[in-house]
UniProtKB/Swiss-Prot annotation:
This is Ciliated left-right organizer ZP-N domains-containing protein. One of its GO terms (cellular component) is extracellular region. It comes from Homo sapiens. Residues 216-230 have a biased composition (Pro residues). InterPro entries: C1orf127-like, DUF4556. The keyword Signal applies. Residues 206-242, 269-422, 434-520, 632-656 are annotated as: Disordered.
Length: 823
């Protein structure tokens, strides 16, 4: 009785089961249902949506090991491979060339991966579609095969972007958040080193801070404890091995930063992990090497790329990207901090979309008592603004804002106009996150030919008097910012420079009406030095003493200057007199090392037409004998050069001029006027309390000689001519470059045939104080991407020597400004 139903049940199972499921795939999902032999998988079937997984660059299909041989046979037949290439080893290499991959899973099954750019992948509407077939065992005809449709939507969100912020204490990574194609999203989890998995709410237990909105995810990690140290191609990098995971998907947040350092090197390194930045399959690690096809650095055209199977390393000269900003140490001490921002565009052969990788790296904050971080790097900045002294500014000078950022290149004005104080974002602040630094737009420079940065300076340190001794009390110096035009071609010297001090954002240069400068300090022939500077083209307004940059972009950039022996005396500039017309202004971008220095004891060469003798003079105030004639001012006329106003003044376009690092410069220009300058007339303030120096005899005059077209060398010393005051000990060594080709329309009436006249000079400096020269300061600033080396060699240069004693006669007399001739 009991055996009959059991036997009947067994017979029924034996007869029915083989005919119901003859050629079906075994699916892992409980919701998947196998189909009968008479049926094939079509788009209407519910199986393809569960078995096909879609990612950013590819789609995958799980293949049981019992069916992988049928897939191989179909692929070999479709790709028309010969019989000898149908073995598994040869087949896999052939499949890779077409964008197909068969990966062995840990359980013995296979994962079939198809790139969206693979062979036979079709684009229909907003989907990628591929039809494949799997042959049944022992059958080669398509009539006995199973058909599968692999179909994935095109992702609209661009996931090939990553922004990395490398701070001294933490690393911050920001990436676009993937958008799901359906509502079946599972919560995102954090995976560290592929092992530790935590929810976003528990990320703080790992020391991580997460800010996630609808479009962006930002993660901040401390440097201590979570980073892995890597040695990559003889360089060091610290890697954050962090991923976002959800279901079968993984999303990389990996980022690499250089080790923390106080001082930049001559080049900056960017380490980019070789990985897919989009959604990838979570789980088994697939050995894959990406092939770099294209790379571009937006801030520089000079870079070097090396790579291995894990990283792409980009080396960029620091001169093109390094910048400096103000900072505060832990104790509140003000200092400076070097940083750089680099934007790179990359293309890998295996990725459908390009990659945009942005790195911001900040060095340690350096206080006033330590070495400047910018002293050993080629800063992409122009000379720094004047520093009021070694520790404290003079009375009446307001401290500079701590948020002032020094930038150079095309992004300089944008840096100056933005508030770059580091402040936490609102979203991070609500979650108790650490500092969330704002980033600036990259300085995108134009395409130029790549060249090796010239190295032309080898500085030697000499004794120098304490800074600030030559300063004149009671005359506060306005703040200053220096020009955004980069300079190029200076190599840092091995000596340790003095600390960087805060400076101020405006520079006022009072001058007299004649080209003059005070006598330089004592000669130091045993310390030759040349400093190549390339700067913006500057207009010299003769008679008015106004210096402003050229407004015509078609004009050539300023000629480099070879400057020697420039003093660093502390001469303050007076404030403009109320009611006077505004003066022309010029914005300068500073370097990381501000100096309290002036051109009050420097030599300037007044260029005249090629047919006339050249005049050299020293001092800051010059009185000429009365001259008559149209366009010439009356006796004793003086001008004022002010860089704090934007109102134009009468000018005569002349040679390009570069101002050396951060000096309260006192310039003088010959007393001339262009015809009809009524619209631009302006007068400067009257200076009081300034001692004056007079010379009893005119100085020697040397003709201008052209420089040979060869690399720049230290200024050579010519045969000295004894001065009438002081004898041979006060001989002046002067070498001047060829004069600029100036036409009559450029110099106007400045170049006349009148002979040079005896001049009376005065020096704005206390009696008995020896002003230090630039040779003694020996500050090796390095320049950014300015004019090319070929341009610098073909443009005229000016070599100045400061190897003569100061005149002994000092008189405490002050002359007021005389009125200009009426029209």
């Amino acid at each position: 009785m009991w055996g009959s139903p059991a036997l009947a049940w067994a017979v029924w199972l034996a007869c029915v089961q083989p005919t119901v499921f003859p050629w079906s795939l075994s699916f892992r999902s409980d919701t998947d249902k196998p189909s009968s032999a008479a049926e094939v998988l079509t788009e209407a079937s519910s199986c393809w949506t569960d078995t096909v997984e879609c990612f950013s660059d590819y789609m995958t299909l799980w293949i049981p090991r019992s069916h992988v041989e049928g897939l191989r046979r179909w692929l070999a037949r479709t790709l028309h491979l010969p019989g000898t290439w149908r073995s598994p080893d040869h087949l896999d290499s052939s499949l890779a060339k077409c964008g197909y991959f068969l990966h062995l899973a840990s359980d013995g099954d296979f994962l079939f991966r198809v790139q969206y750019s693979a062979c036979f992948v079709q684009k229909e509407k907003a989907n990628y579609r591929l039809e494949i077939r799997i042959f049944q065992k022992g059958v080669m005809g398509l009539e006995r095969s199973d058909r599968y449709i692999m179909k994935c939507p095109m992702l609209r969100s661009r996931l090939g972007q990553e922004s990395v912020h490398c701070g001294p204490m933490f690393i911050q990574v920001s990436r676009p958040l993937p958008l799901w194609r359906d509502n079946r999203q599972t919560p995102w989890l954090l995976s560290l080193r592929g092992e530790l998995v935590a929810s976003l709410e528990d990320a703080s237990l790992m020391g991580l801070y997460v800010d996630m909105n609808a479009t962006t995810v930002t993660v901040q990690s401390p440097r201590q404890g979570l980073l892995q140290r890597w040695e990559v191609l003889n360089t060091s990098a610290e890697l954050l091995p962090l991923w976002l995971v959800s279901g079968h998907h993984a999303y990389s947040l990996e980022a690499a930063c250089p080790p923390v350092s106080f001082q930049p090197e001559s080049e900056v390194l960017v380490h980019i992990p070789k990985q897919r930045l989009g959604l990838v399959k979570r789980g088994s690690y697939i050995e894959e090497t990406l092939s770099l096809r294209f790379l571009r650095v937006h801030q520089s055209n000079i870079f070097m790329v090396t790579e291995n199977k894990d990283f792409v390393v980009v080396s960029i000269p620091a001169a093109g990207v390094l910048q400096v900003q103000r900072c505060q140490e832990v104790g509140g001490t003000p200092g400076t901090q070097a940083f750089y921002r680099v934007d790179l565009s990359l293309e890998f052969a295996e990725m459908a979309a390009p990659v945009l990788w942005t790195v911001e790296s900040f060095f340690q904050c350096v206080g006033s008592g330590t070495e400047s971080p910018a002293s050993t790097a080629a800063l992409r900045t122009t000379p720094s603004p004047p520093s009021p002294g070694p520790e404290t500014p003079p009375a009446g000078v307001p401290p500079a804002a701590s948020s002032q950022v020094w930038a150079a290149g095309p992004a300089a004005q944008e840096w100056l106009s933005r508030d770059l104080l580091h402040r936490p974002s609102d979203a991070l602040a609500k979650k108790g996150l650490g500092p969330f630094l704002q980033t600036a737009k990259p300085a995108r420079r134009g395409q130029t030919s790549a060249s090796i940065l010239p190295r032309v300076v080898q500085a030697q340190r000499g004794p120098q008097p304490p800074p600030g001794e030559a300063g004149i009390p009671g005359h506060p110096t306005p703040p200053a910012t220096l020009p955004s035009e980069p300079v190029e071609g200076v190599q840092a010297s091995p000596w340790r420079p003095r600390p960087v001090l805060p400076t101020h954002p405006a520079l006022t240069l009072p001058v007299s009406s004649d080209a003059s400068s005070p006598s330089p300090p004592a000669p130091r022939p045993e310390r030759p030095e040349s400093l190549l500077v390339s700067g913006p083209s500057v207009t010299l307004t003769e008679g008015l003493g106004t210096v402003r940059p050229e407004q015509d972009p078609a004009k050539s950039p300023g000629s480099p200057l070879l400057l020697r022996g420039l003093s660093s005396g502390d001469v303050a500039a007076p404030e403009p007199i109320m009611g006077e017309p505004g003066q022309a202004s010029e914005e300068f971008q500073p370097l990381a090392r501000p100096w309290r220095a002036t051109l009050a004891a420097e030599e300037l060469v007044s260029h005249r037409s090629p047919g006339e003798p050249q005049e050299t003079c020293s001092g800051t105030e010059v009185e000429r004998p009365r001259q008559t004639g149209p366009g010439l001012p009356r006796e004793g006329a003086r001008g004022h050069m002010d860089l704090s106003s934007s109102e134009p003044s009468q000018d005569i376009e002349g040679p390009g001029l570069s101002i050396l690092p951060a000096r309260d410069a006192t310039f003088s220009t010959p007393s001339v006027r262009q015809p009809d300058p009524s619209a631009w007339l302006s007068s400067g303030p009257e200076l009081t309390g300034m001692p004056r120096v007079r010379l009893a005899a005119p100085l020697a005059v040397l003709p201008m000689e052209p420089l040979p077209p060869e690399p720049v060398r230290p200024a050579a010393l010519l045969t000295p001519e004894a001065s009438s005051v002081g004898g041979p000990d006060q001989a002046r060594y002067l070498e001047s470059a060829p004069g600029w080709p100036v036409g009559q329309e450029e110099w106007g009436v400045a170049h006349t045939s009148s002979p040079p006249s005896t001049q009376t000079l005065s020096l704005w400096a206390p009696t008995g104080v020896l002003l230090p020269s630039l040779v003694e300061l020996e500050y090796p600033f390095q320049a950014g991407r300015g004019a090319s080396l070929q341009q610098e060699l073909t443009e005229p240069t000016l070599a100045l020597s400061a190897e003569s004693h100061r005149p002994p006669e000092l008189q405490d007399s002050v002359e007021g400004l005389s009125e200009r001739p009426s029209r």
